[in-house]
């Protein structure tokens, strides 16, 4: 021990340790030992966790035929040192090992921080000759192929994180007896103890990273590799003609550096993934956004290519008249009207869109004929992307060929591999773009300036994973990898959106880099059905932590009655879908509320017939989006619900059932039942959601309005098949500064009659509701409601009726409705 202390003292003072001696770096629960035989062992809590760790690089010298590879297991180090350091994360000490093959040197660094519970690994390669440029597309910052048991737990699983949200992929979970490669970050966790291992890249400026993990017997690490330079079919780097993976681009310079990788063991794997995301955000801050969750409506849920301006206006008006006063608006009292694909220049003219933004949806007054009208004070959205479609190769790029700007076609801006266009999917129509080509900048500048003139404040950018592909070369010679090109292109979009005060939501997009958008779709396209909701929650089960990277996670448009589904969705199915929005972040409706939206073709339907089911959707929307308690949560909070137990799944890709979110005033718990046939019964331990029983004032279920009686250590739930329950636990001691403020200035009531059912929703609790015809005769009545919503059967003729609601506080509210 005295010898070891002397060696460590030498390391800290002189910087370099004798290569014949053991070098040991300790900090907190960590120990890193570089033995005298050059083996590297990582211990955690006194247990060997990773043995025979190594680094490896391949390289070539630009302008020469020289190339090589260096592996720390096969070359003796020229120096080993322990040095103090300070970076964006904090200060600490690092073990640095240098290896040289006579042409280039590899520096392997493992850093431990004074105040961080993890290790950071990086590898750097540089030429031994001054002035030479070195290039690498394969840098392993940390690896092992030696079996070692994880420090805790005997029933581990591992999480595979998808590269992007395209192709209907999912987060996947495997027994820890297989091998997988996760994208950018991987996690191994024990479902019983929650102990976890997390490894992931915290730099996303140059590299695509692959995290390869192989386990055995659910407790042994057999292989671990943290690779800068990973490409595959799933990163959309694939040549469909030759059936080969396209290699990663080269990082080059006086030296080439890998990404930095966080490596950590955590008592709770969920804390580990959150810590990983927070570390990324410390290094590269996310795009700032203080506007809260977007709440609104999108044309893509149902209207799609049949969209037209009268239908959009009627839908927006219905939302304003019937849902706004029930709290369906964002924290700034606005809703979004998002015009998706097939709007600009297809179903709607530029002039019509401009009229929407500058007049109909504005926050001021405008003239329509002799009338002065008040705008709806809504935010208008439009749809764009970073992609090239194969039918546009010869088409002129808008924004080029004007003034002194050169003319370009979309084919000019293609990113090519082996001289050919790079298609992201076999037989697919969309192709990779070179975001560094001037045509892209000119097009974005032209497009967003037009949108700004139309008062666009919300932009959905789709297929932007087309900008992160690898290729032969880029227009800008300083760009040499797909990630570098993506950052270049997204910065153009972000800077323009910032200039025009626009919210950016990414649709089909890589998860990393993240700093160029305020929101991102957490998964691929989904609409109304129960299985689609389970798919959305798969992304929250294993990817809720991405709310540290994006201000808003987006669950796609929330559809109640999908076109062509013949109103087959149950109310439980609708509640599940709406709750996926609550648990994720954004709250965007997808239904049509207008009979002016008609089919523009006869492809599977009658041309000219009304699209979908507007009247049925209105009735359901009042039930689902007229719930003031649900709306209040979405309006006043950002961030995603966290899984309570990630080990409750029954399949490799399935979502969890129970999620929670802690706010200053409440703890929210959502319990999903994705089974169509069997009720789900159980209980939630207060300990599992982080609240003391003595701090619970009331438990209310928000969909039924019922008050739940808790037990000493838990509360029970019973969720019908294909349904969901959301419990709100009010705290006795709430955070004063952040208590939710109800922005509704006065109670309000909205109602709709659809078929033989009347739905009444209010922003405050109702005691009873009566329905009157215009003669004053009561045709229906319901008492003892004690909830913000009432649904009752009616048998009435077409015509106008009056709803009269007796509120819980004794006041009365009325609304006029029409039975059609």
Regions found by a protein language model. Give the residues of each.
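C-terminal beta-strand-rich structural cap/linker in extracellular carbohydrate-active enzymes
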Residues: 711-734
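Sec-dependent N-terminal signal peptides
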Residues: 3-15
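Exposed aromatic-hydrophobic patches
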Residues: 682-686, 714-717, 789-795
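C-terminal outer-membrane/trafficking sorting elements
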Residues: 9, 738-820
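Glycan-recognition surfaces
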Residues: 404-438, 442, 488-603
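Carbohydrate-binding surface patches
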Residues: 119, 581-584, 589, 646-692, ...
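Carbohydrate-recognition beta-sandwich/jelly-roll modules
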Residues: 24-26, 31-334
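Aromatic-lined carbohydrate-binding/catalytic grooves of carbohydrate-active enzymes
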Residues: 293, 297-449, 454-478
């Amino acid at each position: 021990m005295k010898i070891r202390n002397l060696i460590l003292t030498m390391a800290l003072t002189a910087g370099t340790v004798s290569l014949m001696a053991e070098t040991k770096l300790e900090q907190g629960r960590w120990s890193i030992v570089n033995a005298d035989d050059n083996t590297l062992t990582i211990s955690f809590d006194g247990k060997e966790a990773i043995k025979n760790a190594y680094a490896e690089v391949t390289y070539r010298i630009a302008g020469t035929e020289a190339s090589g590879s260096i592996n720390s297991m096969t070359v003796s180090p020229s120096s080993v040192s322990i040095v103090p350091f300070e970076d964006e994360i904090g200060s600490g000490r690092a073990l640095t090992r240098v290896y040289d093959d006579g042409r280039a040197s590899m520096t392997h660094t493992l850093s431990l921080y004074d105040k961080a519970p993890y290790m950071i690994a990086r590898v750097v390669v540089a030429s031994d000759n001054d002035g030479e440029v070195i290039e690498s597309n394969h840098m392993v910052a940390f690896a092992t192929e030696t079996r070692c048991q994880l420090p805790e737990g005997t029933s581990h699983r591992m999480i595979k994180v998808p590269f992007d949200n395209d192709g209907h992929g999912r987060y996947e979970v495997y027994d820890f007896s297989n091998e997988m490669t996760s994208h950018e970050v991987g996690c191994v966790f024990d479902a019983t103890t929650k102990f976890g291992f997390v490894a992931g890249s915290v730099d996303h400026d140059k590299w695509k990273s692959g995290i390869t993990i192989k386990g055995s017997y659910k407790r042994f690490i057999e292989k671990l590799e943290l690779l800068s330079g990973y490409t595959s079919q799933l990163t959309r780097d694939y040549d469909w003609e030759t059936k080969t993976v396209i290699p990663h681009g080269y990082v080059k310079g006086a030296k080439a550096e890998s990404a930095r990788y966080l490596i950590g063991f955590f008592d709770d794997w969920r804390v580990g993934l959150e810590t990983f995301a927070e570390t990324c955000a410390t290094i590269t801050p996310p795009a700032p956004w203080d506007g809260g969750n977007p709440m609104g409506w999108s044309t893509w849920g149902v209207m799609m290519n049949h969209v037209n301006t009268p239908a959009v206006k009627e839908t927006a008006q219905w939302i304003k008249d019937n849902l706004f006063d029930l709290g369906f608006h964002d924290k700034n009292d606005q809703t979004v009207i998002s015009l998706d694909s097939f709007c600009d220049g297809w179903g709607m003219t530029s002039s019509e869109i401009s009229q929407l933004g500058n007049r109909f949806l504005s926050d001021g007054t405008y003239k329509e004929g002799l009338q002065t009208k008040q705008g709806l004070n809504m935010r208008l959205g439009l749809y764009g992307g970073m992609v090239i479609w194969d039918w546009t190769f010869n088409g002129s790029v808008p924004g080029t060929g004007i003034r002194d700007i050169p003319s370009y076609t979309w084919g000019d801006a293609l990113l090519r591999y082996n001289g050919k266009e790079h298609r992201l999917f076999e037989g697919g129509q969309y192709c990779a773009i070179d975001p560094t080509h001037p045509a892209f900048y000119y097009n974005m500048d032209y497009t967003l300036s037009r949108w700004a003139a139309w008062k666009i404040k919300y932009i959905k950018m789709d297929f932007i994973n087309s900008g992160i592909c690898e290729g032969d070369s880029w227009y800008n010679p300083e760009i040499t990898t797909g990630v570098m090109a993506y950052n270049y292109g997204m910065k153009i979009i972000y800077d323009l959106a910032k200039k025009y005060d626009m919210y950016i939501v990414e649709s089909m997009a890589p998860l990393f880099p993240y700093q160029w958008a305020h929101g991102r779709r957490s998964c691929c396209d989904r609409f109304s059905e129960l299985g689609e909701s389970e798919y959305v929650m798969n992304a929250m089960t294993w990817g809720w932590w991405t709310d540290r990277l994006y201000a808003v996670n987006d669950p796609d448009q929330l559809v109640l009655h999908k076109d062509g589904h013949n109103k087959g969705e149950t109310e439980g199915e609708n509640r599940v879908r709406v709750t996926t929005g609550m648990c994720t972040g954004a709250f965007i409706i997808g239904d049509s509320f207008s009979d002016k939206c008609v089919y523009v073709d006869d492809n599977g339907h009658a041309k000219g017939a009304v699209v979908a089911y507007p009247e049925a959707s209105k009735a359901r929307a009042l039930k689902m989006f007229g719930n003031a308690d649900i709306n209040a949560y979405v309006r006043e909070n950002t961030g995603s619900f966290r899984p309570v137990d990630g080990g409750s799944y029954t399949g490799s890709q399935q979502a969890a059932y129970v999620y929670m979110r802690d706010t200053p005033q409440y703890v929210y718990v959502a319990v999903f039942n994705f089974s169509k046939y069997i009720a789900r019964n159980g209980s939630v331990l207060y300990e599992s959601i982080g609240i003391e029983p003595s701090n619970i004032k009331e438990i209310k279920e928000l969909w039924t309005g019922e008050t739940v009686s808790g037990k000493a250590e838990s509360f029970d739930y019973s969720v019908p098949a294909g349904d969901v329950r959301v419990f709100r636990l009010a705290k006795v001691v709430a955070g004063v500064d952040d208590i939710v403020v109800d922005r509704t200035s006065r109670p309000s009531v909205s109602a709709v009659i659809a078929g033989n059912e009347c739905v009444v929703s209010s922003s405050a609790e109702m005691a009873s509701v009566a329905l009157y015809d215009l003669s004053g005769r009561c045709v229906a009545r319901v008492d003892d409601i004690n909830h913000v919503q009432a649904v009752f059967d009616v048998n009435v003729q077409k015509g106008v009726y009056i709803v009269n609601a007796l509120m819980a506080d004794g006041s009365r509210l009325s609304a006029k409705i029409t039975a059609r």
